Swiss-Prot record:
Pfam families in the cross-refs: EFP (PF01132), EFP_N (PF08207), Elong-fact-P_C (PF09285)
Role of this protein: Involved in peptide bond synthesis. Alleviates ribosome stalling that occurs when 3 or more consecutive Pro residues or the sequence PPG is present in a protein, possibly by augmenting the peptidyl transferase activity of the ribosome. Modification of Lys-34 is required for alleviation.
UniProt pathway annotation: Protein biosynthesis; polypeptide chain elongation
Chief localisation class: cytoplasm
Name of the protein this chain belongs to: Elongation factor P
Organism of derivation: Serratia proteamaculans (strain 568)
Record keywords: Cytoplasm, Elongation factor, Hydroxylation, Protein biosynthesis
GO molecular function terms attached to this record: translation elongation factor activity
Gene: efp
Amino acid sequence: MATYSSNDFRPGLKIMFEGEPYAIESSEFVKPGKGQAFARVKMRRLLTGSRVEKTFKSTDSCEGADVVDTNMNYLYNDGEFYHFMHPETFEQHGVEEKTVSDAAKWLQDNAECIVTLWDGRPIAVQPPNFIEAEITDTDPGLKGDTAGTGGKPATLSTGAVVKVPLFVQIGEVVRVDTRSGEYVSRVK
């Protein structure tokens, strides 16, 4: 794998640091008036999702991580693992529940997700940016009830709870942004 100098750090670059893969989120190169130049880096630990701030000297370097983002289709959950399949090779991967974490509430059958593989092992799952799901439970919207914020909680067929406008009813299909968890529109 390639070696990257701290001068080459860019957002999106995946490196090995302390034996684990990290994704660089931001990098600021600083040249003080006195002393050696350095890079102030914010990065995310891919195995846990935690964020780390680290300062690298200009002479430091890190090896590139052998991490691959792959589009895969979500198949099913057997209670212990979430199963994904590569659409071209039909290779299947079982992903542990702790790895899927918050993405689980957005998963629908055959949804195309981005699965991050490290040494052939799934370490992260990113759901599609937008999903269309049916509303299974919400309060009825009463005519003239517009005082307040103008929204009500609704449970989707995936199990996620989102805030929707008062006019949305049970059985309607809505479009939701999975990155923010916000209602986008009704689907006709």
